[in-house]
Amino acid sequence: DLVVVKGTTNGTITDFEGGFTLNVPSNSVIVVSFVGYKSQEISVAGRTDLTVTLKEDTQLLDDVVVVGYGTQKKEDLTSAIATLSPKEVLKSPGGITDALQGSTAGVNVSGGKIRIRGTSSITGSTDPLWVVDGIIDASGNIPNDNEIESIQVLKDAASCAIYGVRGANGVIVVTTKKGAEGKPKVSFNAYAGFGSNTSKVDMLNPYDYAVYVNELYYNSSDANAIANGTWNKTVPTGVANPSNPLGSTDWWDEYFSNTNYQKYDLSVSGGSKYASYRIGATHADNDDKMHTEDVKVDNIYANVQGTVGRFTYGGRIFANYSRTNGFTGASLMNTLQTPSNLPVYNEDGSFFLTGNNGRDGSDLVNQIWFLRNEKLRNRSISALGSIFGEIKIFDWLKYRLTYTYSFARNNDATLIPEHDLGTANGKQAYNSQTTTKGGSGHEIIENLLTFDKTFNDVHTLSGVVGVVSEKFDGWSTGISGRSNEYASFGPESRFPDSQNITSSQYNEAYFSYLARVMYSYNSKYMITANFRADESSKFKKGNRWGYFPSFSVGWRVSEESWMKDATSSWLNNLKLRATLGWIGSANAVGRYDYQSVVVTDNRYYTFGPNQINPEGTASNASAPLIENFANPDLSWETTRDAGVGFDLDMFNNKFSLVFDYYN
């Protein structure tokens, strides 16, 4: 904290505990200030002991925006970046995803999918890139909503091009809370709630359903037979009959049920002048709306950072363990197609087994049986570790090296017991288990050189240059088998009959150069240029490099003297912006599409009797097969993004408007 006598240069700095001593005249006014807090003026009035409490300046905190590989003053931004308040996230039961809907222009959320300014790939993924505490592709590493400090949405090429191929669909940048100098602070939050499906499909009751089915049969019968009076009006076997209803079932209510959830999170933070920390844990327990799953999730996390002289260091760890137990296999569509006059259970409590659906003779299986009997089990663990070291070469020049590694392991299993549901498609004379195991790893190494220099108090030049490498690897194994002995989850050896084993493995890599330069004249005229060069292993040599530049300019009209003279009483900020950029994407291309892929499969070969010898039978043998042919011309998808816009703040920042037009 800085303490000065108002109107003078007489001042001092507080100590570690916030105390200070300053010799002043008895009628002085002192000004106490600290970065991120509102300054406070206090009249001494002859006193020798003062207690001062500063309030957080939320407006000032909003003035610094996290951008790609750095931060920037909001007033100097020339690109389309939206900020979402963490308070809005806490108000939304669905977290960040739901909070973005309707609160951020150009962002559409539907079915849990986020789309920033529409679709940017023809066939590939259109999900945005998540960057958490500077770590790319880390959407699953946010401990809980209470740990969020800031959220920025990068929407245009001018802001996303610095991420190259990874930022083709927009970028969501999340910064989590860090520890601060001071005594340990403990925070605990507990949540509990319930939910229900309020949007219900209105279905016909049994009588109306039977009438409509009979009408269907009447209207679809042979016209000549009806004209000649030979049409048989007897209801076909198995078809709903108004005079003989079997029951009255609301299949929607049978399929869905209420949701109950609870969540707890605990955090501890603190530190000294040399190091600070924030550690915590979260537990969540949730069952879904189809009484099929109970999901439990636990995570632990820690953030540590410190400064010694010109050297700054830090690290972040996050680990997550989730387990799901429940049932699966039921189809909502098939459930709703089940006639409402059919019951779920027989009088003895056993499941009612249906035959055809009463309309076209198609097999109809009691879907509620699957909700009670087809078992699902999932176990997954993921972890991330990141460390960095930063040295201040000069006051205006820093070098940072960051290493991040994350991995995930999963074990999924599905068990279907022996059953006979009364139809050809509803019979299985054995117990079957399918197990899928997999793992993945992701390594990131970043070398960044950042600079920020001001000349003659009005010319500011800042930016970053760097080299980034990424490696991905993964594997999966699937085993399915049958057993007439075991009807519960167990090792694969319990299900030895008709075993089928599949496996796969992959590797993927990127190597990138990046640069951003921003020039500002007195925070009035701004220009920013970004450049990213990406090399991807998805393409053949010769096509692997993609080059993606972007440019943006800004003009703060409100800082012009002629504008200030006319509007100073009500206009706080008016900034015009224009952007142009190109972003690349490799999402639509498979890892090995540029090469011929050979697989082993069973095919008919002329090793024995064949078509040449009609009296024999073709031989079915396992042999190599080209699954797809090489396409060496595959290259990058490229999106060109151009836009103009303005930012307007009026009436002491009580009214704000952001407008963007883009193509």
Over which residues does each language-model region extend?
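Short, small/polar-rich motifs associated with maturation and membrane association
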Residues: 1-301, 305-307, 311-314, 384, ...
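Short aromatic-centered micro-motifs
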Residues: 32, 130, 344-345, 519
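Extracellular/periplasmic, surface-exposed regions of secreted and cell-surface proteins
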Residues: 126-127, 262, 297, 303-321, ...
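Short proline/glycine-enriched turn/loop segments at secondary-structure junctions
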Residues: 161-164, 332, 565-567
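C-terminal beta-signal and adjacent terminal beta-strands/loops
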Residues: 196, 253-255, 334, 569-572
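A surface-exposed, glycine/aromatic-enriched loop/edge motif typical of exported proteins
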Residues: 201-234, 320-359, 414, 473, ...
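Extracytoplasmic gating/loop element in the C-terminal half of outer-membrane beta-barrel translocons
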Residues: 237-243, 422, 497, 536
